[in-house]
Amino acid sequence: MVRTLIISAASGAALMFSATAFAGGQGPEEAKAMLQKAVAAVKADQTLALIMFVKGEGGFLDGDLYPFCFRIADGKSLATPKAVKAGSDVKSLKDSDGSSYGLELFAAGQKPEGEITEIKNYKFPKPGTTEPLFSKISFVTKVGELACGVGYYK
């Protein structure tokens, strides 16, 4: 009985470890941690932070995690993944299902500074690809005149 319980527990732990390893360990906690790091970088030196975000430098490209930023006044994308053209209007973004997730991103940027909004289940390509599209969840917050976010893929 005890041996069966130990084997079952070990098997369950192995399955959990495998699922975490397969996911790359990049979920909501890692996305929120990178968002906090991005917010600190923007507050310290906005211009340098945006350059690092675009280039994926300073730890701002970790597997599928990366920050993005846009101006809260007009929604103009300033730091974006390659799948979104820099300078485009974030409000016009729609996924392959027609979901206007860009309007949700923009609305999240209008909330009080420091408030983090979760944007759920829109489809977006992973970094360096244009297809296929994957289900993504992003966390967005206002930082001065910008809104920045980091998302993870499900």
What annotation goes with each model-predicted range?
Residues 2-11, 15-154:
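N-terminal membrane-sensor/transducer module of prokaryotic signaling receptors
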